[in-house]
Design a protein with these regions (language model features):
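Short, linear, compositionally biased motifs with a strong N-terminal bias
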Residues: 13-14
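Extracytoplasmic c-type cytochrome modules immediately beyond a signal peptide or single-pass transmembrane anchor
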Residues: 24-129
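Short Cys/His-rich "knuckle" micro-motifs
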Residues: 145-146
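N-terminal signal peptide c-region/cleavage motif recognized by signal peptidases
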Residues: 17-20
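Bacterial N-terminal signal peptides that target proteins for export
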Residues: 1-10
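The canonical Cys-X-X-Cys-His
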Residues: 130-141
Length: 146
């Protein structure tokens, strides 16, 4: 049986159009990068490196709140990835990891609430709590660059 001449290019095109499946570690990294992209502009304001615009800051805080929990759903039991910086302690100490997640989500909610008040001192304080929460989790559960 002979395949039509145009079938091979069509199959190649079909293969290229299929999404590339990312590893669990890559998916988590992409999700955390979204958080970082939402968080960084607020940091410029919190450190007086960018002007404070209340409506814009509220949108940024809300965007962060909407995506904050997403990466944590990707730490499934069989998702250890050799390329990832995720430490094995995530899976061996799940209660501690869950506590860090909750601290982060609570801090993000508080930042969102502070943003709505327009009180820049409260915003800066809340931003610092979120940043500290990130650091605390990274110190315990994120390994060095590979």
């Amino acid at each position: 049986m002979t395949l039509p001449k145009n079938l091979a290019p069509a199959l190649a095109l079909l293969a290229l159009s299929l999404p590339v499946l990312a590893s669990p570690g890559e998916e988590r990294q992409q999700s955390f990068k979204k958080i970082l992209r939402a968080f960084e502009p607020m940091g410029l304001v919190a450190r007086d490196r960018a002007p404070y615009r209340k409506d814009e800051f509220i949108k940024q805080a809300d965007a962060l709140k909407q995506i904050a929990a997403a990466p944590f759903t990707l730490f499934t039991p069989n998702s250890i990835d050799a390329k990832s910086r995720a430490k094995p302690e995530i899976w061996s100490q799940p209660e501690k990891f869950k506590t860090e997640q909750q601290k982060f989500l609570t801090a993000v909610n508080e930042l969102d609430s502070a943003a709505k008040t327009g009180d820049i001192a409260s915003i800066k304080r809340s931003y610092g709590v979120v940043a500290q929460s990130c650091k605390s989790c990274h110190d315990s559960f994120r390994g060095p660059e590979k």
